[in-house]
Amino acid sequence: MKTVAFLAVVVLFAAFACASCSSSYAAPAPAPAAAPASSYSSVPAPPCPKNYLFSCQPNLVPAPCAQQAAPAAYGSAGAYTEQVPSYIGFAPYQQLQQYHQRIGNAALIDELRSLGQGIQGQQY
């Protein structure tokens, strides 16, 4: 623990020393260069390619209309006529009550067995 504290103090001292050294001995930052004058010669752009997939020239030919699809044999709602099974939901109250009763009976039987074994092991 002492080593960690010592290292922390050394690191802080080194950081403080570097910060003070760089601020007192550093040269001032140079001023940014001025923007160059617009002395560029105008170079014409190359002509647009005519035999490439993508070109500068717009292709204004209208796209042909798609043909109407043939109607399906089962009708518009045919995919939804079958009943969807429901896997998530509440169990009927009677089944739920029977389930809890069976669990309670099993716990009671286990408790009675353990009590019976405890009584048999004791001597009066």
UniProtKB/Swiss-Prot annotation:
Q: Which GO terms describe its molecular function?
A: structural constituent of vitelline membrane
Q: What is the recorded name of this protein? A: Vitelline membrane protein Vm32E
**Position of the signal peptide:** 1-19
Chief location of this protein within or outside the cell = secreted
Q: Please report which protein family the annotation says this sequence is part of.
A: Belongs to the vitelline membrane family.
Asked if Secreted is a keyword of the record, the answer is yes
Domain VM positions: 42-81
**Disulphide bridges in this chain?**
none
Q: Which UniProt keywords apply?
A: Secreted, Signal
Top-level taxon of origin: Eukaryota
Q: Where in the cell is it found?
A: Secreted
Q: State the InterPro entries in the record.
A: Vitelline_membr_Cys-rich-dom
PROSITE patterns in UniProt: VM (PS51137)
Q: Which organism does this sequence originate in? A: Drosophila pseudoobscura pseudoobscura
GO biological process entries: vitelline membrane formation involved in chorion-containing eggshell formation
Function, as annotated, reads: Major early eggshell protein.
- GO cellular component terms given for this protein: extracellular space
A Pfam family matched by this chain, by name?
Vitelline_membr
